[in-house]
Structures are given as structure tokens and as C-alpha cells.
Amino acid sequence: IPPPTLKNDMRRLINNEELSDVTFIVDDKPVYASRIHLAARSEHFRALLFGGMKESVSGNVKIQISDVPYPVFVKIIEFLYTDNVTDIAPDIAVPLLMAAERYLLGRLKGLCEDSIRKSITCDNVISLYLASHRHRATGLKEICLDFIIDNLDTVEKSRGFHVLKDQSQICQWKLLWREYQNGKFQTAKFT
């Protein structure tokens, strides 16, 4: 029996102009896709492409995307075609997480959280925690809190900790640490 080829076949369709019927313009660059495939994989794209909006007309459609950077949007298309993403670079992980939230792609959001978890440092954990809070990335928020608890002495001395504009957040972290040390830690207070 020959090995399965579906994933590789789908990967060859990513950004394939010849087999596309929708073109997204992102940062003045085209991203080619198949409307039926996007609609099958995403409620957001189904509504956009077949929900009665001007984008839902037949023929090759062009859609301007102005709020997602090109490398992030290409990763979204890769995910929609393959149910996975290769090599989430640290510089696009948080924007990709935000886009996954916007486009209602729960699995992609989880993949981003996992990728970010692997790159957390004492210098970036505070900004990642704040981003997770803004974008309702509960899994990432818990990962950040665990990292902060395990490394609070170092995190507290980091540049990331001291750039917080709201001093009450610094006090919250100190109280969190004291409660943790005294066995009274409750995550819900800080999420």
C-alpha cells in the first residue's frame, strides 16, 4: 500500500494561483486560495465568502486584508489547508495567535500557545502574559503564570517586569508570589 499523500497534496495547493478562485491582497502581495476549501475549514471564511457579502459573488474574487501581516496570513492559509503550521517564528507567534482568535481557529490558537510556551523567557513573559490576557488565550495565560511563579525572583528583576506602566500590576505579582509561598494561591484572582 502506498503511503498517504493528502497532506503533501494539500500543501502544494497553498498560495497556488492556477487553482485558486479567491485572491487576498495582504501588504500589497497576493495570497491565492480556494473559496470552497476555506469555507469548509472556517466559519469566518464561510460567512465572508458565501454569506451574501460582496465577497460572495462567483468568479475570481479579490479581498483586501489590512489588519493581518502577510507572513501571518500565509500561516493561516497553511493551517486551513493542512491543519498544521510549520515553524512558527517567535516574531509572528503572538500576531498569529491574535489572528487565530479573530478567525475562530481554536486548534491554530493552541498551536501558537504551544510555540510561544517554548520560547518564554524572564524578559518576555510579562508582555506575553498581557497579550494572552488581551486575546483571551487562557492556555497561554496559565503557562505564563506558572513560569512567573517558578521564576519570580528573576522575572521581578527583568526589564519586562519594570516596563509595566501600571504599578498595581507589579503589586499583584508580588502578592501572587506571597500567596503561592503561603499555599493560598488562587489563579482566578490574576486572570
Question: Where do the protein language model's features map onto the residues?
Answer:
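Canonical BTB/POZ domain core
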Residues: P2, N8-T121
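BTB/POZ-protein C-terminal extensions
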Residues: A89-M98, R102, L111-D114, S119-T191
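Generic detector of well-ordered alpha-helical segments enriched in charged/polar residues
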Residues: K7-I14, R46, F50, V74-I77, ...
